[in-house]
Amino acid sequence: MRFLIVTGLSGAGKTQAMRALEDLGYFCVDNLPPVLMPKFAELVAHAENKIEKVALVVDVRGQKFFQDLDWALGELTKLGIKYEILFLEARDEVLLKRFKANRRGHPLGVRGSQILDNIKKERKFLENLRARADKVIDTSDLQPADLRNEILNYYGEEQKRSKISINIVTFGYKYGLPLDADLIMDVRFLPNPFYVKELRPLSGSDKPVYDYVFNYEVTKKFTEKFLDLIEFLMPFYQKEGKSNLVIAIGCTGGRHRSVAIANFLARTLEEKNYEVYLRHRDLEKHREE
């Protein structure tokens, strides 16, 4: 039985994660009190109709919650039930924006308290639990569909895969590093189409920009060597039990060079029969500024 505990910061996307897990065939329970977790796990393990995958969504509700959860996790271990923890988080300003958009109060809020103060308080409460998590997803820059795809990718066919899946994400250094990246490659050393007037409004997904970037010998040599490195590392990551490799490709704004390189890598790795997922995190951000 796969026993997954979904937790994290309020507003980080636990509801969307649960819906994705349900689509994967998980038996999902929302807001089960931690003190009931060991008994629930026993009942599920010995159910007449065998349940293969279980996901419990656990929210913060106060200091006693953490004492109860710590006890419950210890009891699960005593019962021989192997569990995994998925922790969802987001940046403070993103969580604040979500709470205001939904016009909801924070679970830790009391009359007169500020949402941002409660977010910081909850983050502090959850530090130790986050450190114990098997998987941490930062949803700050993810749309609901992106989070769903990440859940489906990581928890879907993991046990059946013979190869690691590869997530390639592009980003702009001016917007910050992706927090979940395993490998980060800085491609700001490549010639920059931004300084070519007719190419500036385009992206690395447009042929003129792509051709400009790959017209240079340094680009061809770099991508050849980087592909060699990725393929060299894959069997070692697989040997240690890794099922998903996140490769982040960054340039200044995340629009030209990183996108062109990532598109090339994704296409080439797919041709080599790797399972590849591609996302351009900051591609549209210039339109919002």
From Swiss-Prot:
Keywords: ATP-binding, GTP-binding, Nucleotide-binding. It comes from the Bacteria. GTP binds at D59, V60, R61, G62. HAMAP family: RapZ_like. This is Nucleotide-binding protein CHY_0272. One of its GO terms (molecular function) is ATP binding. The keyword ATP-binding applies. Pfam families: PapZ_C (PF22740), RapZ-like_N (PF03668). ATP binds at G8, L9, S10, G11, A12, G13, K14, T15. The keyword Manganese does not apply. Belongs to the RapZ-like family. Displays ATPase and GTPase activities. InterPro entries: P-loop_NTPase, RapZ-like, RapZ-like_N, RapZ_C.
